[in-house]
Amino acid sequence: MNKIRTIKLYKSYFKEFYIAQPKGVRDKINYSLYMVETMKIIPSKFFKNIVGSNGLYEIRSEYCGNIYRILCCMDNDFIVVLLQGFQKKSRKHLLKKFNWQNDLEKNISKRKRVCNMETGKKERILRCSTFEELLNEEYGCTGTPDREAFDSKAQAFCLAEQLKEERRKVGLTQEQLAKRIGTKKSYISRIENGHTDIQLSTLFRIFAGLGRRITFNVF
């Protein structure tokens, strides 16, 4: 994948949360993390600043109606450091209970130390310190069947969310967009639902109809 940012894991906090989740939840979390690493502009639905915090952000994932939130901070414009994960709670509750602001204040001036990730000592903790290493442990190295399947689905997920975001910005329904570019509404729906069997020529027509340029990895 063509990365814009690099995701790193701080200590074992996120890994303990991650490994406790069922496979479907882990996949959805990884789609969101893939989006953070590869998309220049990340939809606010998936990545936003936490108001009232000192440099904290949240990455969101959804699975079967449940919301999963990952607290993170930026080491610089190109490095995202994952701190902890939770099922949906209010921002106020998260900041009060876990008091990450104090921890960040101690580490924010020593960002290089923050990025020296420590491997957890508990059993069954993942041994990875970056998102790329996490993908290797979860799906195998680049080029293996499981990894190729994940990459294809993750790219389709990013494309689907990019299309939804751009379509809503210009105020078009799926039906209106389909009529504008001369295709079927069902085709727009398939893309927005993350299907991978999409013709490139149609993708370019769709985004041209939105007055947008599209950049993505071919899958």
Predicted regions and their residues:
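Basic, Lys/Arg-enriched alpha-helical interface segments
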Residues: 1-67, 76-80, 88-116
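Recognition helix of helix-turn-helix/homeodomain-like DNA-binding domains
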Residues: 181-196
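Short basic alpha-helical hairpin corresponding to helix-turn-helix/winged-helix-like nucleic-acid-binding
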Residues: 34, 38-44, 48-55, 142-170
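N-terminal flexible/basic segments that precede or flank functional cores
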Residues: 106, 117-158
